[in-house]
Every structure is written in C-alpha cells, then in structure tokens.
Amino acid sequence: MNFDHEELMLMMLYNTGTRLGLIHELRLMQCYLMPDETALRELSEGVIEKLKLLTDAEFAELELPPD
C-alpha cells in the first residue's frame, strides 16, 4: 500500500502502535473536526480506508514510531 507524505505524517501523529488503534484514534480525531475542516476529514478518511486494506503484518512493516 502506498501512502503519500501527508498521509504518513497524519499516521505518525496518531499512531498507537497498532493498525486498529490508529484507525480508532483517527475516528476520534474526526469527532472534533469543525465543519469547514474538509481537507483533514478527507485525508483521514483516505488513510482509514487504506488501513482497512492492510493486514496487521503489513502495518507493522511501515515502521511508524508510536506516539
């Protein structure tokens, strides 16, 4: 799975060390977005969709440092 620079930065900010934990944190973050923060909502939705397609083993290979 290919992630662009913005996606990787978002993932590093919210990384908990697990794929499902990261998805959960991104969903929580979305709850606090203002209606005009559409770019961040779209970015996080795209990351979540890509993360859903990864296995836990593939996620572990991304080498994202946990928060």
Per-segment meaning from a language model:
Residues R27, C31, D36-D67:
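Low-complexity intrinsically disordered segments
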Residues M1-E25:
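N-terminal acidic leader/helix
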